[in-house]
Amino acid sequence: EGTVRERDSKNAKLPTGEIEVVPGKIEVLGRCQHSELPFQINRSREADETQRLKYRYLDLRNPAVKNNIVLRCQVVAALRAAMTEHGFLEITTPILTASSPEGARDYLVPARKHPGKFYALPQAPQQFKQLLMTSGFDRYFQIAPCFRDEDARGDRSPGEFYQLDMEMAFATQEDVFAVLEDVLPPIFAKFGTYDVASAAPFRRIPYNTALETYGSDKPDLRIDLTCKNVSKLFENSEFEPLRGQTVKMVDISDCTLTRKQVEKLLSDCEVQSGSKAYWFKVDEKGELAGGIAKFVTDLRPQLEQVLTLAPNTLVVVAAGASATKSAGVLIKTFGAACAGHMDQERYEFCWIVDFPMYEIGDESGELEFCHNPFSMPSGGLEVLLKAERGEIDPLTITADQYDLVCNGVELSSGAVRNHDPEIMVK
C-alpha cells in the first residue's frame, strides 16, 4: 500500500518517469532463500551464461531481455495481420514427419510403437506446403518452427528457429516480390531500431553483378563503396602477391583513418576472409603513399580511369582466388569505419536475382547444380534445349531463384518451383 505522487524530477526515458510510489506498507509474498541475488537483474546480460540459464526467471525480469520477447510477439502479430490482409491462410503443418533430404541433419524422435523407426522434426515445411498448393490452397503462410541439427551461426540459433514461411500457387517471381515489398517495410520501420525502410520496389541486383560490384551476394546498400576489377593492370606486376592474380580495389574518399587503424582493420578483414589484403593512399598533396604505393605509382594513369584518386583517398586491395570475397569484406568493414560512407539509420532492402542454374564443381570438375535444383530455369524448357544443342553455354542459364537481403544480411531465399516433369527430367 502507498501513495502515488508526481515526481519532483521527471525522467521521460522511463515508463513511470513522471510518477513515484511512496510505500506506506510492504508485505513480502515470497521470501528468498538466499541473502543476495546471483546477479543484478538490470545487468543480467553481463552475467555468466550458465548463471543466466540457471536463474532464467530472474534473467527474464531484466527489461532489456523481456522487451525482446514482447517485440517478437508484436512483430509476429503484425506479420499475421499483413499476410491475412493479402489473402493468405495461416495453416499449421505437422511437427512429427518423415525424414527427407535437406541441407542439414535431422533431429530424430523414436517411434514407440515401431521399434527401430523414427520420426524426423521438419527442417522446413517444404513437402506440406507443396501438398497444400496441389490441394487448392493457393496462398499459405505460417510462423513455422524449423529444426536443424547444425552448428550455431552468428545470425541463427542452433537447433531450432522460426521463420515466416509462405507459398503461392500460379505465381510469378514478381508476384512474390510484390507481397513482401508491401509487408516488410512498414513492420521494420515500426518495430526496428531505425524508422526508415526502403520503399517498394526494392532494387533487383543480378547475382553476378552483386559479386562484381559489391564482392558479396549479400550487399549492404547503406554503404556507398564498390570494388573495381583491375586484374589486367597487374599481369606483370613487380609485386608478387598481385602478379597474374585477380585484383580488386576499393577506393574510399575523404578517409581520415591513421596507418595504425588501417592495418588493424586489414588484419580483421584477413581473419574474416582468410585472404591477406593491402592498401595505399593518396595523401594531402595528391601523392601515392603508404602500403604498396611504390608498386602502383607507375600505373596511376590507368588506375585513375577506374578509381577516384583525389587527395585523402584510401585504396584497399584484395588479390588471389578469393579476391571477390575479400573485397566484399573490405567494403563492409571500411564502409562502416570511414565516416560519411554508410547511412546507418535505415533499412535498405534488395533482391538478389538471376542466380546461375549450373556451375563447375570444385571437386568433380563437371557441371553441377549451383543452388536449388528444383527451381524453374529462366526460359523454361527451351533454354535447356538450346544448351543441349550447343547453342548456348549451360553456365549462362539462370534460375528463377532469389534472395531477400537487408543491410547485408540474407533474410530469406525463394524460388519459382519447377512444376513441369519434362523440364525436371531434361
What name fits each language-model region?
Residues 1-426:
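Class II aminoacyl-tRNA synthetase catalytic cores and aaRS-like
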